């Protein structure tokens, strides 16, 4: 399971300006701040959608002109040494995913920053429930939602119950022994939230390396990343 929320993308204006520095070609730039709400079917150079019956301010974007897009594509195909502008376009997003996936994401340390919810400090903050864990592939569900206790899904439910027992014990007597029981018993399927900031270069690296990955989480994230502004156009993706 993976959930992605609160996506923000910025940096287009300065990235494009810097992209044109080597050839002093700023006068050829044809991109501009705009608004695209998805209802009007247009992008207005003035940043105001028509008609004006609805508020479009949450849909601010940066409209790429054909000149800038063509140069972006050319530099993109030239390789990482030529497409430095990608490292100046920034995306931030909140990702909730299981610990087993985060271990793989930590491969991408260069050019990324992640701030996570703290397991060390807050593991006891709320009751554990099955929805806190990624278990969509576990076997064991019987008709009408019943669970076979000897199945993988049943083992997870037993583990969740034990985690709650240790949590209750810790809340009644907050000593480190009970805390250790939760920390060391916590399965790698536990879903953890992080706020991640990275560049478009990181985005394209992930797409190249993970799009066909065996984990659903990677494939789902890749589909979301391909939906970021202008990613498909710049990279020639489908």
What are the roles of these predicted feature ranges?
Residues 1-238:
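Family-specific signature for flavin-dependent thymidylate synthase
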